[in-house]
Amino acid sequence: MDPNTVSSFQDILMRMSKMQLGSSSGDLNGMITQFESLKLYRDSLGEAVMRMGDLHSLQNRNGKWREQLGQKFEEIRWLIEEVRHKLKITENSFEQITFMQALQLLFEVEQEIRTFSFQLI
């Protein structure tokens, strides 16, 4: 797992939490929850790849891991669209920077998850 990605997740989550305090927006809380869930999934998939014979363990533990993988890609696409929408409507430069970094992070994580999943197949 790339330490830069981990610190990027932490930075984005901290920034979004600060934005949430200054906003009454409930959908931002949902985005934060989705980011946290995505980070945990990415980390667990990365750990499975690190152990490399762990495919059978992963399949035994979760027989529907391919379905779950598809759902995670749908979540990523949803988050990308939400972040793009937020980026279009916000005029606050702090929020714009945060959403641009979040968007970049989502693209990186999507690529990492694709790479991990191809290694497991």
From Swiss-Prot:
Subcellular localization, as worded in the UniProt entry: Virion; Host nucleus
Pfam family, one: Flu_NS2
GO BP: exit of virus from host cell nucleus through nuclear pore
Cellular component GO terms held in the UniProt record: host cell nucleus; virion component
Keyword terms: Host nucleus, Host-virus interaction, Transport, Virion
Residue ranges annotated as motif Nuclear export signal: 12-21, 85-94
Family that this chain belongs to: Belongs to the influenza viruses NEP family.
Function: Mediates the nuclear export of encapsidated genomic RNAs (ribonucleoproteins, RNPs). Acts as an adapter between viral RNPs complexes and the nuclear export machinery of the cell. Possesses no intrinsic RNA-binding activity, but includes a C-terminal M1-binding domain. This domain is believed to allow recognition of RNPs bound to the protein M1.
Further information: Average number present in a viral particle is estimated to be 130-200 molecules.
Quaternary context: Interacts with protein M1. May interact with host nucleoporin RAB/HRB and exportin XPO1/CRM1.
UniProt-recorded name of the protein: Nuclear export protein
Organism this protein belongs to: Influenza A virus (strain A/Chile/1/1983 H1N1)
GN (gene name): NS
